[in-house]
From Swiss-Prot:
It is found in: Cytoplasm. It comes from the Bacteria. The lineage of its organism: Bacteria, Bacillati, Actinomycetota, Actinomycetes, Micromonosporales. It holds the Pfam family EFP_N. Involved in peptide bond synthesis. Stimulates efficient translation and peptide-bond synthesis on native or reconstituted 70S ribosomes in vitro. Probably functions indirectly by altering the affinity of the ribosome for aminoacyl-tRNA, thus increasing their reactivity as acceptors for peptidyl transferase. One of its GO terms (cellular component) is cytoplasm. It comes from Salinispora arenicola (strain CNS-205). NCBIfam families: efp, PRK00529.1. This is Elongation factor P. Belongs to the elongation factor P family.
């Protein structure tokens, strides 16, 4: 149990039986009336974002989220199997829980899996990964590094916009947060 004065970005709250992560918060002290805390909360399971206002000092129930580094093993249908690197236990994470991270997951890649009471909540990848381009249209002679971009399919099946000079078989660095091309690897 904590108060609204203790809120931090990333903290997970248990409100009405649902888990909500604090995306943003602001303490407001108006000239007239009592202080309050304006928050933006994201539902950990559904991804829904809401704005909620609390009176300052209100008690809120915090949830314990366990973050562990795990190794991605394989896809099992629409689900993904990870192995805990310390205990070697395997857990299955639903495809909806993995979300967009699936576009950048390679077997044996490490990721942080957050759980609450042994239920996987979300998967965090490193900010960038190195992937091999499996297909892209050939560039034309005279292509420059300052030119436009073209779509390229990487080994995970995701499509990334790359500069015209990138060819099939090259390894590129991709930002996992937004899928941007960062450079050659």
């Amino acid at each position: 149990m904590a108060t609204t004065n203790d809120l931090k970005n990333g903290m997970v709250l248990n409100l009405d039986g649902e888990l909500w992560a604090v995306v943003e918060f602001q303490h407001v002290k108006p000239g007239k009336g009592g202080a309050f805390v304006r928050t933006t909360l994201k539902n950990v399971l559904s991804g829904k974002v809401v704005d909620k206002t609390f009176n300052a000092g209100t008690k809120v129930d915090t949830a314990t989220v366990d973050k562990r580094t795990m190794q991605y093993l394989y896809a099992d249908g629409e689900d993904y199997v990870f192995m805990d690197l310390e205990t070697f236990d395997q857990i299955t994470v639903l495809g909806d829980t993995v979300g967009e991270a699936a576009n950048y997951l390679l077997p044996e890649a490490e990721a942080v899996v957050a759980t609450h009471e042994s239920v996987p909540l979300y998967v965090e990848l490193p900010t960038s990964v190195v992937l091999e381009v499996t297909y892209t249209e050939p560039g034309l002679q005279g292509d420059r590094s300052t030119g436009g971009s073209k779509p390229a399919t990487v080994e995970t099946g995701a499509t990334v916009q790359v500069p015209l000079f990138i060819t099939t078989g090259e390894k590129i660095k991709v930002d996992t947060r937004d899928g941007r091309y960062l450079g050659r690897a």
